[in-house]
């Protein structure tokens, strides 16, 4: 799950 979180964080920052 940590790996997926990294990608999610990038998207959240964009928003």
Curated annotation (Swiss-Prot):
Its EC number is 3.6.4.10. One of its GO terms (cellular component) is intracellular membrane-bounded organelle. It comes from the Eukaryota. It catalyses: ATP + H2O = ADP + phosphate + H(+). In response to endoplasmic reticulum stress, de-AMPylation by the same protein, FICD, restores the chaperone activity. Keywords: ATP-binding, Chaperone, Cytoplasm, Endoplasmic reticulum, Hydrolase, Nucleotide-binding. GO terms for biological process: maintenance of protein localization in endoplasmic reticulum; negative regulation of IRE1-mediated unfolded protein response; negative regulation of protein-containing complex assembly; positive regulation of cell migration; post-translational protein targeting to membrane, translocation. One of its GO terms (molecular function) is ATP binding. Coiled coil: none annotated. The keyword Repeat does not apply. The chaperone activity is regulated by ATP-induced allosteric coupling of the nucleotide-binding (NBD) and substrate-binding (SBD) domains. In the ADP-bound and nucleotide-free (apo) states, the two domains have little interaction. In contrast, in the ATP-bound state the two domains are tightly coupled, which results in drastically accelerated kinetics in both binding and release of polypeptide substrates. J domain-containing co-chaperones (DNAJB9/ERdj4 or DNAJC10/ERdj5) stimulate the ATPase activity and are required for efficient substrate recognition by HSPA5/BiP. It is found in: Endoplasmic reticulum lumen; Melanosome; Cytoplasm; Cell surface. The interdomain linker regulates the chaperone activity by mediating the formation of homooligomers. Homooligomers are formed by engagement of the interdomain linker of one HSPA5/BiP molecule as a typical substrate of an adjacent HSPA5/BiP molecule. HSPA5/BiP oligomerization inactivates participating HSPA5/BiP protomers. HSPA5/BiP oligomers probably act as reservoirs to store HSPA5/BiP molecules when they are not needed by the cell. When the levels of unfolded proteins rise, cells can rapidly break up these oligomers to make active monomers. Monomer and homooligomer; homooligomerization via the interdomain linker inactivates the chaperone activity and acts as a storage of HSPA5/BiP molecules. Interacts with DNAJC1 (via J domain). Component of an EIF2 complex at least composed of CELF1/CUGBP1, CALR, CALR3, EIF2S1, EIF2S2, HSP90B1 and HSPA5. Part of a large chaperone multiprotein complex comprising DNAJB11, HSP90B1, HSPA5, HYOU, PDIA2, PDIA4, PDIA6, PPIB, SDF2L1, UGGT1 and very small amounts of ERP29, but not, or at very low levels, CALR nor CANX. Interacts with TMEM132A and TRIM21. Endoplasmic reticulum chaperone that plays a key role in protein folding and quality control in the endoplasmic reticulum lumen. Involved in the correct folding of proteins and degradation of misfolded proteins via its interaction with DNAJC10/ERdj5, probably to facilitate the release of DNAJC10/ERdj5 from its substrate. Acts as a key repressor of the EIF2AK3/PERK and ERN1/IRE1-mediated unfolded protein response (UPR). Belongs to the heat shock protein 70 family. This is Endoplasmic reticulum chaperone BiP. The lineage of its organism: Eukaryota, Metazoa, Chordata, Craniata, Vertebrata. The gene is HSPA5.
